[in-house]
């Protein structure tokens, strides 16, 4: 698909720019870490990707193996969906989605409609067809508001760590690794994004210090310790007392 070619070229271009800043003297650590984390950033989870993952034949085969399902016996799989208004609006074309989310009233109204936990039996024909149709929107994905948001966020993150490469190489590497904090879908993604933003705010606070990279590593590890990020907040509080 044209969208896949576009994504591959975009990935290569972004990585080439980083490799040009890197060197053998540093064992290309920044480039290696960037290759992994930029790829993960481009494979963000939205409704289209979640639908794609849930309708793959390999997934059903894996579940059958894990459950020890006897051949010709059909296993029934129930999925839990909990989309927020943001996930739905994220599927809109960029211009329409941007217009829609500017109104808090529209967003609240939509959230009341969609933000309800739903259990869907994905092995039933109607549910499977719905998910399959959604998964087929992969080529449309690059036109959505969510794609534009993810693209801009990724660019900001890349520009952030690239700025530290000449003088604080190790800090740049640690900022690259912070991308692992962002994962999942819906509420899980929101929590991860919040931890990522707080960790990078801490990186900015310590950026002039010789031990800046160590501090960012500590912040990242603290962010992974609990769901809400309380350990991270504690580490940030410590930083503010020493700068």
What are these regions (language model features)?
Residues 2-6:
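Short, small-residue-biased leader/transition segments that mark boundaries at the very start
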Residues 7-26, 154-163:
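Short amphipathic alpha-helical segments and their helix-coil junctions
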Residues 20-34, 169-173:
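Structural motif
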Residues 26-31, 50, 211-212:
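Short, surface-exposed acidic
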Residues 44-46:
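Soluble, non-transmembrane catalytic domains of enzymes that act on hydrophobic metabolites at membranes
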Residues 51-243:
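C-terminal amphipathic alpha-helical interaction region
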């Amino acid at each position: 698909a044209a969208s896949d070619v576009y994504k591959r070229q975009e990935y290569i271009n972004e990585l080439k720019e980083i490799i040009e800043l890197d060197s053998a003297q540093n064992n290309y650590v920044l480039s290696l870490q960037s290759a992994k984390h930029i790829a993960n950033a481009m494979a963000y989870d939205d409704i289209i990707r979640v639908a794609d993952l849930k309708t793959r034949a390999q997934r059903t085969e894996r579940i059958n193996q894990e459950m020890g399902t006897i051949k010709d016996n059909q296993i029934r799989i129930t999925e839990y969906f909990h989309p927020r208004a943001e996930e739905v609006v994220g599927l809109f074309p960029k211009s329409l989605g941007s217009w829609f989310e500017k109104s808090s009233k529209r967003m609240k109204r939509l959230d009341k409609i969609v933000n309800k936990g739903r259990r869907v039996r994905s092995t039933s024909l109607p549910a499977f067809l719905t998910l399959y149709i959604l998964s087929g929107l992969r080529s449309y994905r690059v036109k959505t508001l969510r794609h534009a948001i993810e693209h801009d966020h990724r660019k900001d993150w890349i520009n952030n760590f690239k700025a530290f490469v000449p003088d604080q190489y190790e800090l740049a590497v640690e900022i690259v690794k912070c991308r692992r904090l962002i994962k999942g879908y819906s509420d899980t993604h929101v929590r991860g994004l919040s931890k990522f933003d707080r960790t990078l705010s801490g990186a900015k606070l310590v950026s002039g210090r010789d031990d800046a990279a160590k501090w960012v590593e500590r912040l990242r590890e603290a962010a992974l310790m609990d769901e809400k990020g309380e350990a991270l907040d504690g580490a940030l509080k410590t930083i503010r007392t020493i700068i």
